[in-house]
């Protein structure tokens, strides 16, 4: 009697997990096929070409900053400037920026002053870039991005023609280590389902989001939402600014721009781990109960189908419902695999084979959620970009 009751509970849980993955597959397939692409609107003709200030914060980016700035200085748009801000780098980043600025009048080299304690480093650097800017439109991008020559003109054309207040592009995400390549498809399933362009672009939906690798906003509207000063303590400042835009009832458009911008998402497994922790730990401190529910949800939908499979074969094989449970488990795993492959190939534009590593990806994400839950109770430290930020309240402030 006990095994049957237990089997019934497990069966109900796994049916719910199956329903979740069915939903995810339908959602990401619909979103990928219907999401707008920059090339659809890139060639609109506009009469004016307002000046654009491209703001590039950089900290210890000697391996990527040169090719990034070269790609930005090679844009086919006429009226723009590039402002590169050194955020207290300890490598060759400052000298690379300085030497390049001497050769190209468009590039303005800025040394960020000492950062106040209640500011996150990148946010402070972006704010310094804004203060030095002279353009009507601001483009914020990262120092590890590479831009196609017509990325700026295409984005400005789209923004002006569509009478947008802000525009952000989904970049082609690049990573080099195998663990990150296996993890990214699974992680992006959740991100894509939450921050799908179809949701962000819906004015009736409150969800707003910027991709930090490329977001364009008029200086007037940037000031209206409070600049980076309003999100000075946010580790995920791009997402916070995107939310501010939607809260102010501004017209935000998120479009796929993988053919125009490439961005380095995680450089190694350590970067991947800390990138996840900077999202998860603040979540546990802001909304503890919700975070625990999310952690439990992540565990069940990612790992439970694999963990329960051998028990189904060993202990429930003689029950009629055991066969039903086995079928549900196998179908769920197949759907998980399908979602991962679809997201890898069509969503991330990387090889489909990386979607096959979904078991490793599921394990990494689940472990990070579980470990971060324990860490949030003790040493509330998040490491990001060679700095350690201590979280001493539910959300703020962060201290070096």
Residue ranges with predicted function:
Residues 92, 141-158:
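Acidic donor-binding/catalytic loop of UDP-sugar-dependent glycosyltransferases
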């Amino acid at each position: 009697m006990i095994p049957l009751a237990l089997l019934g509970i497990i069966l109900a849980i796994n049916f719910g997990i199956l329903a979740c993955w069915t939903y995810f597959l339908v959602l990401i397939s619909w979103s990928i096929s219907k999401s707008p692409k920059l090339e659809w609107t890139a060639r609109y003709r506009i009469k004016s070409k307002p000046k654009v200030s491209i703001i590039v914060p950089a900290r210890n980016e000697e391996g990527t900053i040169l090719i990034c700035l070269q790609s930005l200085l090679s844009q086919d748009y006429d009226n723009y400037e590039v402002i590169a801000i050194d955020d207290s780098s300890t490598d060759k980043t400052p000298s690379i920026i300085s030497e390049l600025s001497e050769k190209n009048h468009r590039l303005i080299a800025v040394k960020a002053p000492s950062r106040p304690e209640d500011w996150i480093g990148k946010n402070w650097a972006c704010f310094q870039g804004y203060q030095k800017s002279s353009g009507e439109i601001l483009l914020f991008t990262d120092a590890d991005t590479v831009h196609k020559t017509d990325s700026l003109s295409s984005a400005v054309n789209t923004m002006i023609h569509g009478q947008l207040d802000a525009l952000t592009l989904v970049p082609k995400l690049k990573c080099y280590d195998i663990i990150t390549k296996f993890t990214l498809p699974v992680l992006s399933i959740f991100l894509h389902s939450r921050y799908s362009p179809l949701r962000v672009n819906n004015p009736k939906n409150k969800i707003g989001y910027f991709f930090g690798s490329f977001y364009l906003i008029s200086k007037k509207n940037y000031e209206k939402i409070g600049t980076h000063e309003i999100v000075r303590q946010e580790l995920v400042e791009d997402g916070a600014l995107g939310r501010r835009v939607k809260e102010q009832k501004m017209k935000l458009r998120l479009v796929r721009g993988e053919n125009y911008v490439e961005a380095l998402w995680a450089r190694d497994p350590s970067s991947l781990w800390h990138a996840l922790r900077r999202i998860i730990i603040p979540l546990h401190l802001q909304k503890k109960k919700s975070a625990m529910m999310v952690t439990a949800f992540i565990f069940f939908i990612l790992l439970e189908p694999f963990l329960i499979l051998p028990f189904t074969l060993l202990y429930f094989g003689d029950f009629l419902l055991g066969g039903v449970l086995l079928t549900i488990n196998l179908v769920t795993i197949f759907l998980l695999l399908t979602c991962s492959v679809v997201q890898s190939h069509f969503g991330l534009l990387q090889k489909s084979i990386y979607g096959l590593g979904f078991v490793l990806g599921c394990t990494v994400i689940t472990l990070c959620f579980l470990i971060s839950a324990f860490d949030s109770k003790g040493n509330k430290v998040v490491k990001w970009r060679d700095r350690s930020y201590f979280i001493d309240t539910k959300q703020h402030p962060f201290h070096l």
